[in-house]
């Protein structure tokens, strides 16, 4: 098992970042996400927005890794649940893969909150727990996957910035 974590500060208020995060896919920074379907979306009695989405991703696994894992599949599906609390100004997003689960599990949690010292900024904390199952070199593969998650996190931050910039340019 490998745990990866990160923190990123956006130079935008929470409302702006959350609107962009909800529209994050598709984006040109991370073309491996090839499909997003909203399965369910509802407001609870406290005004929090709950969303269930299904994401389809194209994993660019090197042929050596595919051979070690014993799979030729590159399309994977991810289940995502998010809760946006506009009163507390907090968004929590949890995701987990629902394909290749016999080989690997990736459980990710993202939390968006206003910066405690500057309300014009937003803090994103991310954590991923990666477990490769039943193969030799699992620690090595978990490290590779943590590196990929780190790279994709940066792409995600860039995508949110790109969405914000493009939204602002279309409004002005």
Curated annotation (Swiss-Prot):
InterPro entries: PRELI/MSF1_dom, Slowmo/Ups. GO terms for molecular function: phosphatidic acid transfer activity. Residues 1-172 form the PRELI/MSF1 domain. It is found in: Mitochondrion. Keywords: Lipid transport, Mitochondrion, Transport. PANTHER family: MSF1/PX19 RELATED. This is PRELI domain containing protein 3A. It comes from Xenopus laevis.
